[in-house]
Amino acid sequence: MSLSQALSAAGLIRPTRRRGFCPACRGWATGTADQTGRAESEISPPALTALAFLISAAAAWALTIWQARSTDGMAMGLGSLEAFATGWVVMMAAMMLPSALPLVYDFARRSEGRRRWQVATGVLAATYLSIWFAFGLACYFVLTALPLPRASQDLVGGLALALAGLYALTPIKNASEARCRELCALHGPLPFNLVRSAMVVGARYALSCVGCSAGLMVAMVILGMSSLGWVVILAGQILGYKLGPAPTMRRRWLLWAVLVALGVAYRLMA
């Protein structure tokens, strides 16, 4: 199978849709056929929509790197609510949009041609990120309310990583991970109200992702978001949760051991 056939089978490209009233006018107006009569291909609108989200995630990563470098050497802490909220939104766009691309593309492909399908796809992504934003705010308010002494923040950060690994062994994590994999693809036709359907799909998927990655996200909040190295490490773990093969119990224990080792390393390096 050639590359073009593989892309066409995946729905990423398709034959250019002809326009006009007669065959000669269509070929002249759109250039859809060469002298041999072979039809040209175009990138499908759902693929362009997914590409736009991927570019947005890349821009968010660039901004995350810039923020981390501009706060180099900052001590672990949450900072003001405004600064935390801004940094958290950017980080969620960088980390979570790529893992949601399969669902975004599937929704766009199924809804293409219906009224306001582009708006509905944007609503899905916005709902997904809004759930993560609310989770981040909840972590912020809970952690700022706890009387954590500054002298033991490095110990708290190490414990957070160890507890994130322990959370990976819980039934809640396992059930959420299975649900997350199930909701990554749509099943059946979309309802008539496309925008409302996008909100429901985005909210359900986000809630399953929160249950799947809550331990790592709490650790990220506690460790502080100014450390680019920890952001990349935890982002890789989350991407593996969502897009990798379903882990066995042995792999779950291995993940716990890795996170415990990272917690010890963080405590020693702090």
PLM regions with names:
Residues 3, 37-39, 84-127:
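Juxtamembrane transmembrane-helix termini in multi-pass membrane transport proteins
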Residues 51-59, 82, 86, 90, ...:
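Lipid-exposed faces of alpha-helical membrane segments in multi-pass integral membrane proteins
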Residues 56, 116-144, 213-248, 256-260:
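A small-residue-rich subset of transmembrane alpha-helices
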Residues 96-104, 210-216, 228-229:
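Transmembrane helix boundary and interhelical junction motifs in multipass membrane proteins
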Residues 133-183:
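Transmembrane alpha-helix/helix-exit interface in multi-pass inner-membrane proteins
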Residues 169-175, 194-225:
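Alpha-helical transmembrane segments of helical membrane proteins, especially in multi-pass transport
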Residues 253-270:
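Final/C-terminal transmembrane alpha-helix of multipass membrane proteins
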